[in-house]
């Protein structure tokens, strides 16, 4: 059986991995998953991202903790296969008043809401991370 929403599965694996205090998690890899993971790593929400090559490439994410608590307090899927959410540059949301990050898929690639605002781009809101 095929997976209906691989991005939601990725976010759930991150959420569950941190709830279980896992050091690292792995999942099937895709270009979009790697791009999202790289944005989360650049923002400091996860430690590192590694793609393990093979017949079926695996994405390995090393989770990050601060004083024994997960750095990611909440991670929430916004746009989904059944209901895509697109926003223009002036409509991009601020998560937790600017403390969190919205991951946005734009014509120039996957980036944070802040980077999209600076570049003057809108796009599909993939998820909120705080």
UniProtKB/Swiss-Prot annotation:
Taxonomic lineage from the root: Bacteria, Pseudomonadati, Pseudomonadota, Gammaproteobacteria, Pasteurellales
Source domain of life: Bacteria
Protein's name in the database: Small ribosomal subunit protein uS8
Species assigned in the record: Mannheimia succiniciproducens (strain KCTC 0769BP / MBEL55E)
Recorded GO MF terms: rRNA binding; structural constituent of ribosome
One cellular component (GO) term of this entry: ribonucleoprotein complex
Tagged with keyword Ribonucleoprotein: yes
Quaternary context: Part of the 30S ribosomal subunit. Contacts proteins S5 and S12.
InterPro entries documented for this protein: Ribosomal_uS8, Ribosomal_uS8_CS, Ribosomal_uS8_sf
Keyword terms: Ribonucleoprotein, Ribosomal protein, RNA-binding, rRNA-binding
UniProt similarity note: Belongs to the universal ribosomal protein uS8 family.
GO biological process: translation
Record has Protein biosynthesis as a keyword: no
Cited function: One of the primary rRNA binding proteins, it binds directly to 16S rRNA central domain where it helps coordinate assembly of the platform of the 30S subunit.
């Amino acid at each position: 059986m095929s997976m209906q929403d691989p991005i939601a599965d990725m976010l759930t694996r991150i959420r569950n991995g941190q709830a279980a205090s896992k050091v690292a998690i792995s999942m099937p890899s895709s270009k979009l998953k790697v791009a999202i993971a790289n944005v989360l790593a650049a923002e400091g929400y996860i430690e590192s991202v590694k793609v393990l090559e093979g017949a079926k490439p695996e994405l390995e994410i090393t989770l990050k903790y601060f004083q024994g608590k997960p750095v990611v307090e909440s991670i929430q899927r916004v746009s989904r296969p059944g209901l895509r959410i697109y926003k223009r540059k002036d409509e991009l949301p601020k998560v937790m008043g600017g403390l969190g990050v919205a991951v946005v898929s734009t014509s120039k690639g996957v980036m944070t809401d802040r980077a999209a605002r600076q570049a003057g781009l809108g796009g599909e809101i993939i998820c909120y991370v705080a």
